[in-house]
Amino acid sequence: MAQQKKTIAVVNATGRQAASLIRVAAAVGHHVRAQVHSLKGLIAEELQAIPNVTLFQGPLLNNVPLMDTLFEGAHLAFINTTSQAGDEIAIGKDLADAAKRAGTIQHYIYSSMPDHSLYGPWPAVPMWAPKFTVENYVRQLGLPSTFVYAGIYNNNFTSLPYPLFQMELMPDGTFEWHAPFDPDIPLPWLDAEHDVGPALLQIFKDGPQKWNGHRIALTFETLSPVQVCAAFSRALNRRVTYVQVPKVEIKVNIPVGYREQLEAIEVVFGEHKAPYFPLPEFSRPAAGSPKGLGPANGKGAGAGMMQGPGGVISQRVTDEARKLWSGWRDMEEYAREVFPIEEEANGLDWML
């Protein structure tokens, strides 16, 4: 029997996570009701042309009527809010209330992030901690819910002068990445456009009977900065070097909130070398652990389990995502197949 097609409510539809889900969900016949802040721009125009997708334009802050409309007749919801839209805690709580009020939502997936201050002697990362507050609110409401934690987007890399993930093109044709991350500590990575949608669709297919209340790390690969640069070097056939720096260099105007985010990253990951995901269920052995339990390194890496703080049995951080979606794209493939195309679209010509 064919699976019943359902209606999915989505916010921030032009964002990488939401757009990835919309593309694959609509392609297999689901209907999507999606909020956008503007109908202008390449992604918004793309979404308008996709069958089975209905867009609702408007802000989320203090806009309960739009939220009620968005959830009308929806069976499923994927919610990824951003600080740029306004008070993220207020928006997140209002969305959860609206979903609960609709009475039709069978599974609510919320894109969360950790509050580091709750798990160790570290400050909170300001653009992440509000998401964790909203996660706890959703849990209290009793919505059938799952919480996904996205790794660092591969797609963040650019040779444009944006902070933290600039692959700077040097005069000799090589690239350098300057960031505060420890060069040898693995970080979680995700090709958001390619892999978020299929993974979320599988979570919805499995349903809350499998995933209710569960946290899932949406990361398919853990690589240290040195390993990332090695993957780029192999893909581009150019030397790519990582340089650890204590401070993120700011070359363009950025909002105050993002500047504060970068300052927290310098402290949490640069000075303190804190884990990216400090939650016990995402604990994983550090580099140098016994074979099979160390950081993932490429698609053939083995997997292991360990007991983390509080007795929580922790899967290797990539395991659940890889089981949800086996067609994931690794960093080397991204750097070879996608990075040059994105660069050319941004008006750059180093690859020609």
Curated annotation (Swiss-Prot):
Compositionally biased tracts (Gly residues): 295-311
Region of interest: Disordered: 287-312
Binding site for NAD(+): 16-17, 80-82, 131, 153-156
Keyword S-adenosyl-L-methionine included in the entry's annotation: no
Keyword terms: Cytoplasm, NAD, NADP, Nucleus, Oxidoreductase, Repressor, Transcription, Transcription regulation
Subcellular location(s) per record: Nucleus; Cytoplasm
Effect of residue 193 to Q: No changes in the Kd for NAD and NADP and almost complete loss of affinity for areA
Source superkingdom: Eukaryota
GO MF, one example: oxidoreductase activity
Stated consequence of mutating residue 195 to N: No changes in the Kd for NAD and NADP and almost complete loss of affinity for areA
GO BP terms in the entry: negative regulation of DNA-templated transcription; nitrogen catabolite repression of transcription; nitrogen catabolite repression of transcription from RNA polymerase II promoter; regulation of nitrogen utilization
Factors inducing expression: Up-regulated in nitrogen-sufficient conditions and down-regulated in nitrogen-limiting conditions.
GO cellular component terms given for this protein: cytoplasm; nucleus
Function: May be a redox sensor protein. Has much higher affinity for NAD(P) than for NAD(P)H. Has similar affinity for NAD and NADP. Negative transcriptional regulator involved in the post-transcriptional modulation of the GATA-type transcription factor areA, forming part of a system controlling nitrogen metabolite repression. Interferes with the interaction between areA and target DNA. Overexpression leads to areA inhibition.
Family: Belongs to the NmrA-type oxidoreductase family.
Protein name in the entry: Nitrogen metabolite repression protein nmrA
Organism lineage string: Eukaryota, Fungi, Dikarya, Ascomycota, Pezizomycotina
